[in-house]
UniProtKB/Swiss-Prot annotation:
Localisation per UniProt entry: Nucleus
Reported tissue expression: Overexpressed in prostate cancer cell line PC-3 and breast cancer cell line SK-BR-3.
UniProt keyword Nucleus present: yes
Protein name listed in UniProt: Elongin-C
UniProt pathway: Protein modification; protein ubiquitination
Record carries keyword Nuclease: no
GO BP field: protein ubiquitination; regulation of transcription by RNA polymerase II; target-directed miRNA degradation; transcription initiation at RNA polymerase II promoter; ubiquitin-dependent protein catabolic process
Main location per the UniProt record: nucleus
Post-translational modification summary for this protein: Ubiquitinated by the DCX(AMBRA1) complex, leading to its degradation by the proteasome.
InterPro entries reported for this sequence: ELC1 (IPR039948), SKP1-like (IPR001232), SKP1/BTB/POZ_sf (IPR011333), Skp1_comp_POZ (IPR016073)
Taxonomic placement: Eukaryota, Metazoa, Chordata, Craniata, Vertebrata
GO molecular function: protein-macromolecule adaptor activity; transcription corepressor binding
The entry's keywords: Host-virus interaction, Nucleus, Transcription, Transcription regulation, Ubl conjugation, Ubl conjugation pathway
Transmembrane segments: none
Length: 112
């Protein structure tokens, strides 16, 4: 390998395959970058040329989104990627009534 060490995956560097989303209560969710880009807000934070520190670290802190909501958001990212342009029947995405309002506010903020 000519002294060059190539690393694929992980959360570090501009070509990282994963990003780290951190909830208001400190839980870390490592998700595929492609899935996180479902969110217009995260996409803007991770793609602008040096506008946001998140672009360099591939970490996004959400001071207003608790882990029980952010975990559901991450599930939705996977659901959205899986069923966008799918020819199969799309199952309903389950949402517990107890978190519906918080999830709606998070979805509005995240633009997803």
């Amino acid at each position: 390998m000519d002294g060059e060490e190539k690393t694929y995956g992980g959360c570090e560097g501009p070509d990282a395959m994963y990003v780290k989303l951190i909830s208001s209560d400190g839980h870390e969710f490592i998700v595929k970058r492609e899935h996180a880009l479902t969110s217009g807000t995260i996409k803007a934070m991770l793609s602008g040329p040096g506008q946001f520190a998140e672009n360099e670290t591939n970490e996004v802190n959400f001071r207003e989104i608790p882990s029980h909501v952010l975990s559901k958001v991450c599930m939705y990212f996977t659901y959205k990627v899986r069923y966008t342009n799918s020819s199969t029947e799309i199952p309903e995405f389950p949402i517990a009534p107890e978190i519906a309002l918080e999830l709606l506010m998070a979805a509005n903020f995240l633009d997803c």
